[in-house]
Structure formats: C-alpha cells, structure tokens
Curated annotation (Swiss-Prot):
Active site: 323
Residues the record lists as binding substrate: 222
Reactions mediated catalytically: urea + 2 H2O + H(+) = hydrogencarbonate + 2 NH4(+)
Organism: Lachnoclostridium phytofermentans (strain ATCC 700394 / DSM 18823 / ISDg)
Protein name, per record: Urease subunit alpha
Primary gene name: ureC
Record text on subunit structure and interactions: Heterotrimer of UreA (gamma), UreB (beta) and UreC (alpha) subunits. Three heterotrimers associate to form the active enzyme.
Length: 570
C-alpha cells in the first residue's frame, strides 16, 4: 500500500527532492535538484522513532570488515561541478566510498551504502553539501589564517611564505630547502591541507630544482623578486621536468617587457596566472589579455570581486602596505595608481560569468581576505545574474549552470591546476572526504560543519557547559579532527613527486598524510570545468576598455551585496 504526503511535509522530513528549488543564502540564485538517489519510501533518517535502528535502516548483522561505513551523511543536497542532486554519502577510511542510497540491504532495495553498528550518522536533511574549498593564493603570513579559512569552508591552502617577513607579505614564496623543510614541519600542527610554492624568481636551474626536490608543489614567480623573461623560461623548463605548476605575478611596470613578451616567454607552456585582472599586480594595463590563451589557467583574487562602489578606494591602502610602498615617494604612488583600473575590474566580473576566468582565490593578508573566497564567489554570481540575467541553458527558477560554473572556481579547478584533483576538489567516490555542510539560508557565508577526511574538524557549537549543544553563545569551535594524532590523520601535505620518491616526508618525520602532485604539465584551459572559454581579449591602452571578441564588456559597480551585513555584525 503506497502512502502519499504533501511536498511541504516531505521536504520538512527528508529535505528537498526533484522539482524543488533551494535558494542560496540571501542571493537571487536558486539551485534545482536534478536527481534524487534516496528512493522514495525507503529514506533513512536518524532519531527517536526514526529509521536508522537495528534491523530497520541499520543492518543488524554486518561488521565494518564486511562493508559497513564509518560515516553516512543522509539525504543531503550535493552541489558540485558534477551535478546538483540529492543522495546519501558513505564515508570509509576517510574517503568517499559511495554516493547513493544508504540503509539495510536485508529489507531495502538498491542499497549502495550499508549502515551498521560501526556507522556514525550526520543528518543532512535540508542541508547542502559541497567539496571543501581550495585557495591557491596563500601568503603564509600567520597561522591564525587557518581558523578563518576552515570556518569559511576552505580546507586546502596552496601558497608560500615563512611568516610575517617582508618577502612573504609580498610574494607567496617559501624560498630554499631550509625554509621549505621548516614550513613542512610547521604545518604538521595545522588542521588543513597544505601545498607549498617555492621561489621561482631565479635563472638558476639548480636553485629551482633543489626547491622542488625539497618538497614544494610548484614555483611562484613574482615581480617583487623579478619576473624577467629568463626567470619565466627557466621556471617553466624545470617545472616541465618535474611535473609541477608555475604561478606568476607579472611585471606591473613593464620594465623587463610587456605582456606580449611574457606570453612569448611562456611559449605555450601551462601556467597559472594570479589576479589576472591586474589590480593585485601584473602588466599594466593589459595583463587581463592572458585569460584568452589555452595554456593559461587564469585566477582572480577576491578584493576586486565583485566590483562595488568601494572597490577602487579600498585598493590603494592595501597596495601600499602589501608591496612595501610609501605615500611620500612619488614613484611608489605612481606604481600603485597604475594597478587600480575600474575598467578592467568591471570587466573581470563578466569574464568570470562567461567562464573565461577559471579560478577564485584570496591573496591572504596580502591584498586579499582568506575567509571570503567562497562568499565573494557567490556575491559575484549573484551580481552577474542581476546585471546580465540567466546563463544560457538555465531556465525556470533554477540557476544550475551558473551554480556549477561558480562552485568550480574554488573547488575542482584549483585542484586540477595544482595536480591534486585525484585526492580532493569534488564530491566524488574515491576522493578524501573534505566536505562542507551548509544550511541553505547561510550558504556562502557561514557553514554549519567542516569535515576533514571523514571527521568533523570545525563546527558551529553552543555553550560547552549547556545541557544541549545549541544554547548561546554559538560560535565556531575546533572539533576532534583538529586535535592530537587525529589532526595529522585528517589533513594532507602535498609535495612534488620527486620529493615523495626521495622520502622527504620520512626524513623530516612528518605524521600527516603526504601525497604527491601529478598530471600538471599537459593541462590546458579545456581541463577547467565549466570555465574553459578562450575568446580574443583586447584592452585599449588609453581608455583601458576591455573587449571580448570585439564587444565591449563592462558593468556598473554594486551598491549593495548579498551575504554581507545581514550575516556579519562586525
């Protein structure tokens, strides 16, 4: 005998299903459920009088060794580059083992995920699950950045530095073997995944090679240490040899050549361009043209995203501090002025919406906010919907194509760019369970829970002396994956393949999971999910107007944004 219930009641019990749309925070963006794998009538939920009990939704006889999961997230809405759908997520040994229908196969059909006595449950009803964010532009200036990143939904940091040294505050490099090894040891105590970038600003093949062999996953070229043609060529040559990425912040002053010279020096080899618009640094005024090339993986940093009425004014102060400039030196002021252009900043929003710019990152404490990568990504998506309308292929209520495009910018695409997409970057079977759970009304602003390798690392939590978990003050608090040996077992340090083969992690006594990066040097922009367009981009050298395939692209600055003061008092 079948039983029917209203859609409203079904959603209240089990979360939304096919035909329902979910609003993302207070934005104008909606996602529609494309498929539901949870099997109507056999849904599993936990609690008093609910389904997950022995002999009911829980298999009464199965052991962990026989296939019971370690953790199951029930009835979650998954928002991923690969789709927007509802499913249960089974996690075992810290990895996503299955996505589909969970329960007890002895009494239920089509069970993909077996719940047993070994299984913990997280109730995902009404929640959105995404992959943990990946920020590829980290200045490791202060370890306190990690708490801010985690509580924003970012679980992987890629960048360079050694602390609040002038080199680190400007250039995102961990230079030389000694510094690299000390930083690899230091991040052992941080409950987050880390990959380090070495200093690429040298023409010495030996100096570049020793850094890659020491454990960095890529090289960073920065104009403050020099972004000359020879530097670019040598870094890319050594990167090709060892299969690591090269990230570049090009020559703002055009002292050693123009953007065309940099493009010529790159010579078709894959490269990851930081803040490709240019306010964060790079050939003035036309570094943005590099977004057109198939070998360039272009990224933005978040201070310019989205373009608002305050963007231009804010940037001058940031730039003077971050690049060790002085307001009483005319040349320093001129340098700063050359980088801040409203025309290219406005165009950058549209380049993201068109899928031309592929990655969003922070530039943490160095002209960027580590805790706002995700927020500003969705603010940009919302602004573009309001100013440009729906993306092609989106119809009705849903904005699924736009949602997939923007979620890719801080999950799968940065993972691909740095050769870690086999391990993290999406909600897919076989990957480490770095997952973020969101209440829809807080999506993009404040996550509910952050899971690292299948264990809760951080979460909103009430007063620890209360009789239940929910009394005020509710704040983010580190959870058990942030303590003891569980910290090392729940986080990953990425190194170059050669460093892994040389056993650098063993020589240093690292306890974290250490994994090699690979598959980088044959990448093209076509590998960037939902963000692979390569049109012609031109910049007028007098007016700074940006054109895509001959068409002027610009937009008005936003005077008001979602995911802002409604969510953050301070």
């Amino acid at each position: 005998m079948s039983f029917s219930m209203t859609r409203e009641l079904y959603t209240a019990k089990y979360g939304p299903t096919v035909g329902d749309a979910v609003r993302l925070g207070d934005t104008d963006l909606f996602i529609e459920i494309e498929k539901d794998y949870t099997s109507y009538g056999d849904e599993v939920i936990f609690g008093g009088g609910k389904v997950i009990r022995d002999g009911m939704g829980q298999d009464p006889l199965i052991s962990r060794a026989e296939g019971a999961m370690d953790l199951v997230i029930t009835n979650a809405v998954i928002l991923d580059y690969s789709g927007i759908y509802k499913a249960d997520i089974g996690i075992k040994d810290g990895k996503i083992a299955a996505i589909g229908k969970s329960g007890n196969p002895r009494i239920m059909k089509n069970v993909d995920i077996i719940i047993g006595a070994s299984t913990e449950i997280i109730a995902g009803e009404g929640l959105i699950v995404t992959a943990g964010g990946i920020d590829t532009h980290i200045h490791f200036i202060s370890p306190q950045q990690v708490d801010v990143a985690l509580t924003s939904g970012v679980t992987t940091l890629i960048g360079g530095g050694t602390g609040p040294a002038e080199g680190t505050k400007a250039t995102t490099c961990t230079p030389g073997e000694w510094n690299i090894h000390r930083m690899l040891e230091s991040v052992e105590g941080l409950p987050i995944n880390v990959g380090l970038l070495g200093k690429g600003s040298t023409s010495s093949d030996v100096a570049l090679t020793e850094q890659i062999r020491a454990g960095v996953i890529g090289l960073k070229i920065h104009e403050d240490f020099g972004a000359m043609r020879s530097v670019i060529d040598h870094s890319l040559k050594i990167a090709d040899e060892y299969d690591v990425q090269v990230a570049i912040h090009t020559d703002t002053l055009n002292e050693f050549g123009f953007v065309e010279d940099t493009i010529d020096s790159i010579n078709g080899r894959v490269i990851h361009t930081f803040h490709t618009e240019g306010a964060g640094g790079g050939h003035a005024p036309d570094i943005i043209k590099m977004g057109a090339f198939s070998n360039v993986l272009p990224a933005s940093t978040n201070p310019t995203k989205p373009y608002t009425i305050n963007t231009i004014d804010e940037h001058m102060d940031m730039l003077m501090v971050c690049h060790h400039l002085r307001r009483n030196v005319p040349e320093d002021v001129a340098f700063a002025d050359s980088r801040i252009r409203k025309e290219t900043i406005a165009a950058e929003d549209i380049l993201h919406d068109m899928g031309i710019f592929s990655i969003m990152s922070s530039d943490s404490q160095a002209m960027g906010r580590i805790g706002e990568v995700i927020t500003r990504t969705w603010q940009t998506a919302d602004k573009m919907k309001k100013q440009r309308g729906k993306l092609q292929g989106d119809s009705g209520v849903g904005d699924n194509n736009r949602a997939k495009r923007y979620i890719s910018k801080y999950t799968i695409n940065p993972a691909i760019a740095h050769g870690i997409n086999t391990y993290v970057g999406s909600v897919e079977v076989g990957k480490y369970a770095d997952l973020v759970l969101w209440q829809p009304q807080f999506f993009g602003a404040k996550p509910n829970m952050i899971i690292k390798c299948g264990m809760v690392a951080n979460s909103i939590m009430g007063d620890a002396n209360a009789s239940i978990p929910t009394p005020q003050p509710i704040t983010y608090r580190p959870m058990y994956a942030s303590y003891g040996l569980a910290l090392q077992r729940s986080s990953i340090t990425f190194v170059s393949k050669i460093a892994f083969e040389l056993g650098v992690h063993k020589k240093l006594g690292l306890e974290k999971t250490v994994l090699p990066v690979f598959g980088i040097r044959n990448l093209t922009k076509q590998d960037m999910k939902h963000n692979c367009e390569t049109p012609e981009i031109t910049v007028d050298p007098q007016t700074y107007d940006v054109r895509v395939n001959g068409e002027l692209i610009t937009c008005e600055p936003a005077a008001e944004l979602p995911l802002a003061q409604r969510y953050f008092l301070f």
